[in-house]
């Protein structure tokens, strides 16, 4: 099978979401198992929520304790199933990921997106760092062999800023209301549980 023959899945992604992190971690094996390709669409989760009139689960479910607690159970179940032993909740959550997401667009343009996401994902959801702090973010990128200063310098470029806005608006226009969202054959799938459902539609 050539690359052009592969089924491609658009992945609406922001590292702000722990479920986005969990999906990112299992995607490499998923791609090998099903011979599919995920294309990351870098968006801003806060913007998606605002444009779709949605709220983060921790706010939307704050007055529904059973539902709020279920999300914790369901994450633990996914973590155990996929042996994602490094995952941990970040005590600084919620974290402003605007700079990181702009950096992801820079990395995507320059050809090292997955390496970049691996790096910021570890900082956010394994090392418990306050990745919204510019100095911490730069140091973390540098320690991973990426040029934090150069990446962040480009995040102020108007084209990068506008690209993130457009990606976010386009995602909501297509039907997205949160992360992780997937688009397969023009059908929308939401949540990490969609990874089990999508093979029926390949």
Model-derived features with residue positions:
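C-terminal cap of thioredoxin/glutaredoxin-like
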Residues: 5-10, 14-37, 119-202
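Structural alpha/beta surface segment adjacent to cysteine/selenocysteine redox centers
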Residues: 22-124
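Eukaryotic N-terminal low-complexity, Ser/Thr- and Lys/Arg-rich leader segments
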Residues: 1-3
């Amino acid at each position: 099978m050539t690359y052009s023959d592969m089924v491609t899945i658009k992945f609406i992604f922001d590292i702000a979401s722990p479920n986005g992190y969990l999906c990112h971690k299992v995607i490499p094996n998923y791609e090998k198992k099903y011979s599919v390709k995920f294309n990351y669409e870098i968006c801003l989760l806060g913007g998606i929520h605002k444009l779709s009139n949605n709220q983060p689960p921790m706010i939307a479910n704050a007055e529904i304790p059973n539902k709020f607690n279920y999300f914790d159970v369901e994450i633990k179940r996914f973590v155990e199933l996929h042996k994602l032993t490094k995952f941990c909740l970040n005590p600084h959550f919620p974290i402003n990921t605007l700079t990181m997401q702009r950096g992801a667009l820079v990395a995507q343009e320059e050809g090292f997106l997955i390496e970049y996401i691996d790096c910021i994902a570890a900082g956010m959801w394994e090392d418990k760092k306050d990745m919204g702090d510019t100095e911490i973010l730069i140091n973390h990128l540098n320690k991973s062999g990426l040029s934090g200063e150069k990446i962040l310098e480009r995040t102020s470029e108007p084209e990068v800023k506008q690209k993130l806005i457009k990606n976010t608006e386009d995602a909501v226009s297509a039907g997205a209301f949160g992360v992780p969202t997937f688009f397969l054959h023009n059908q929308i799938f939401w949540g990490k549980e969609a990874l089990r459902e999508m093979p029926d539609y390949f």
